[in-house]
């Protein structure tokens, strides 16, 4: 299980540094223009602000050999507001706060510098936020969204999407479909939404929600908080939670697997009543880990916990009903387990 998550993390990293053809090398804005209309041709679209030599001092030297400064400011692009068509658009922003809206096809959007808004619409879209705090939306279709630098917000929509926050404190929502969501460096908040998703917190103290479906959630380095489903949701799909490095908190629902990893971890078990699948914790260490059972006071007015030995594990029971299987490096004492009303 952990090998799969590591492999998927490598896939995300590899995609981010793909050396193949990249439409950003073309340095082009969208050439799709609605019939009967024309783009507003301004200095920005004629190349001002795109010249790497803009603002260079050509003032010569003083008699003492010191350079003369003309104090020429480097031109910056105005905010770009581009709307594509039903065709396959290539849209590039500048250094301002750009708004790029593509149509219903397989589009490429690159916000570049500035706090940009990118909307791919329907289709299999690729969008890069670039530097700045960007908002990216994929819409329907199997989209790839990259926040790049900055505190970015990514929304995949329907489809099997790849969302990568990259650098910064990012938020990412997969939506419907089997999504791959990666936070990267920073304190990220990730949600898979509906579908069987894989979520990778990366470096930093992350909050990661699997959502509905059978999800795999990996916190990575940092003190992370992981949920297989939305808090309190009666989701019986089997989720796999791995805390990774750091002191992590794992919230398990019915049938979920939890592995804290290195560090002093906390496991929270949500009771869903008789008949719910057993939760399993594979590395509970009573010497350093914490275990909390959340119960319904209407179903359990006077809750009692008990333990019984199993095949290589310890079975935890609530009012005589099996709740979870615990694999521990040493004997477990009930004093190490806390009860908490929902």
Model-derived regions: residue spans:
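Low-complexity acidic/polar repeat-biased segments
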Residues: 1-44, 306-342
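N-terminal segments that cap or nucleate solenoid repeat domains
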Residues: 25-112, 117
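Short beta-strand elements of solenoid repeat domains
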Residues: 81-83, 90-95, 99-104, 108-113, ...
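Feature marks extracellular polysaccharide-active and adherence modules
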Residues: 229, 253, 270, 282, ...
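Short, surface-exposed beta-strand/loop "edge" segments at domain boundaries and coil↔beta transitions
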Residues: 257-259, 299-302, 321-326
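Long C-terminal tail modules that include membrane-anchoring/sorting signals and adjacent low-complexity
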Residues: 263-268, 275-278, 290-292, 316-317
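Acidic glycine-/aspartate-rich tracts in secreted/extracellular proteins
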Residues: 272-275, 285-289, 293-300
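Short beta-alpha junctions and helix-cap segments that line functional grooves
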Residues: 277-279, 303-305
């Amino acid at each position: 299980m952990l090998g799969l998550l590591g492999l998927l993390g490598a896939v995300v990293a590899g995609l981010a540094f793909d050396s193949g053809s990249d439409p950003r090398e073309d340095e082009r804005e969208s050439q799709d223009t609605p019939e009967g209309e024309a783009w507003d041709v301004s200095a920005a679209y004629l190349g001002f602000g795109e010249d790497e030599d803009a603002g260079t001092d050509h003032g010569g030297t003083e008699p003492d050999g010191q350079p003369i400064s003309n104090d020429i400011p480097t031109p910056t692009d105005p905010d770009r507001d581009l709307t594509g068509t039903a065709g396959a658009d290539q849209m590039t922003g500048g250094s301002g706060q750009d708004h790029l809206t593509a149509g219903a096809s397989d589009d490429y959007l690159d916000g570049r510098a500035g706090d940009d808004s990118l909307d791919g619409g329907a289709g299999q879209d690729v969008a890069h936020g670039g530097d700045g705090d960007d908002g990216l939306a994929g819409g329907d279709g199997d989209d790839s969204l990259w926040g790049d630098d900055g505190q970015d917000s990514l929304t995949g929509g329907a489809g099997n999407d790849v969302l990568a926050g990259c650098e910064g404190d990012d938020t990412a929502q997969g939506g419907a479909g089997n999504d791959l969501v990666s936070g990267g460096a920073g304190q990220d908040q990730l949600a898979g939404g509906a579908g069987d998703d894989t979520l990778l917190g990366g470096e930093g103290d992350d909050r990661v929600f699997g959502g509905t479906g059978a999800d795999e959630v990996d916190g990575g380095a940092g003190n992370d908080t992981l949920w297989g489903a939305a808090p309190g949701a009666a989701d019986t799909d089997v989720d796999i939670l791995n805390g990774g490095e750091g002191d992590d908190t794992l919230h398990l629902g019915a049938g979920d697997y939890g592995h804290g990893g290195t560090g002093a971890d906390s496991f929270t078990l949500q009771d869903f009543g008789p008949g719910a699948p057993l939760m399993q914790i594979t590395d509970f260490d009573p010497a350093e880990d914490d275990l909390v059972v959340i119960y319904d006071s209407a179903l359990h007015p006077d809750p009692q916990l008990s333990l019984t030995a199993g095949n290589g594990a310890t079975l935890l029971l609530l009012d005589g009903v099996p709740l979870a299987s615990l694999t521990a490096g040493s004997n477990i004492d009930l004093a190490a387990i806390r009860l908490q009303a929902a």
